[in-house]
């Protein structure tokens, strides 16, 4: 991966990317409110469960397939996997989050000098798929900018984990150093998670995160909340 591709990846995974990632907790806010997550050890268990049962088995393998579809200009496959990812979101909040982030990333790409000329952004069928999930725009941009697939997956994985830790620092609350320790604890596992995701067959893709689904459902009616999911 050349220097330009490396820095474009940093832009895609930056917390400053204006897609509203910081406004979503994916059910963690309710999990903290009800006492499921009270400290750093509870947080570690929560994140480890999501990594093993959702991110590794759904988001990352779908991202890989969206990347390949982008490289081969396969609109049918691109649309299929974008809709598949959205269909796996169990609650209204999680589906809204997926679509809102997908729409926001598409708007960002529309305003970038080279991306504005990509044919995919000019075609309604591609744009419909891009609006289903952030992963679609992430995959398209990664393919167009020459970011290697494994590095794209590593980058997305780190971005997801970092955002979840930032949420936990605000909610539990954890100290900033505690948050960094949590990121460090996971860092040795992330490459193996990416490798596992790359080796998955289509029929094995899916998510099984009942705790997150329950937390997300109950978050929809939580009386006082900071986050949109």
UniProtKB/Swiss-Prot annotation:
A single MF term (Gene Ontology): nickel cation binding
Pfam families referenced in this protein's UniProt entry, alphabetically: UreF (PF01730)
Alphabetical list of InterPro entries matching this protein: UreF, UreF_sf
Places the protein is found: Cytoplasm
This protein's UniProt keywords: Chaperone, Cytoplasm, Nickel insertion
Keyword Membrane attached: no
Coarse class of the protein's main subcellular location: cytoplasm
Keyword Cytoplasm: yes
Top-rank taxon, per record: Bacteria
Family (UniProt): Belongs to the UreF family.
Subunit structure: UreD, UreF and UreG form a complex that acts as a GTP-hydrolysis-dependent molecular chaperone, activating the urease apoprotein by helping to assemble the nickel containing metallocenter of UreC. The UreE protein probably delivers the nickel.
Its job: Required for maturation of urease via the functional incorporation of the urease nickel metallocenter.
UniProt name for this protein: Urease accessory protein UreF
Gene name per UniProt: ureF
